[in-house]
């Protein structure tokens, strides 16, 4: 396999959800949070799929899903009423990391945001993911804000 193979991207289908969950679970910082595929995942997918402000994207290599990310388009009053894109849950199959696929995914997402009229692309990442921080820095993202979460369940 080439060092930097070419990915194709598409909006996920319900049939992709188990593979997406497996990709999300293959992560040392949040993998245990995924749970087994079930009705809550189906309902979440259906809500995402029905919302034009959300896209669950899969990346394919030779017809196999090897990556995923969720894109959310957020209208706002700040920044002159700018539309922004939030990128979340970015994952590449662990056996394919380090081959430039994540860069392809993020560049594709940025172009998709630009095409939809977004003025800003933002993402959050776990503080423990130092390699991810270097990766996002290398793509031109700037660690300009501090994020907080409050678990409600």
Predicted regions located by residue number:
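Acetyl-CoA-dependent GNAT
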Residues: 3-6, 11-18, 22-82, 88, ...
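Conserved beta-strand-loop-alpha-helix junction that forms the acyl-donor binding cleft
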Residues: 122-132, 149-151
């Amino acid at each position: 396999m080439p060092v930097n193979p070419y990915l194709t991207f598409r909006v996920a289908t319900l049939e992709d959800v188990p593979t997406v969950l497996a990709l999300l679970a293959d992560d040392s910082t949040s993998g245990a949070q995924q749970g087994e595929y079930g009705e809550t995942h189906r309902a979440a997918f259906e809500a995402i799929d029905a919302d034009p402000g959300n896209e669950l994207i899969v990346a394919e290599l030779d017809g196999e899903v090897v990556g995923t990310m969720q894109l959310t388009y957020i209208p706002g009053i700040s920044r002159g009423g700018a539309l922004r894109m939030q990128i979340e849950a970015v994952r590449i199959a662990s056996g394919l990391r380090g081959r430039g696929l994540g860069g392809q995914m993020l560049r594709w997402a940025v172009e998709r945001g630009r095409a939809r009229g977004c003025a800003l692309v933002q993402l959050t990442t776990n503080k423990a993911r130092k390699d991810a921080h270097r990766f996002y820095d290398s793509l031109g993202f700037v660690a300009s804000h501090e994020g907080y979460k409050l678990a409600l369940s």
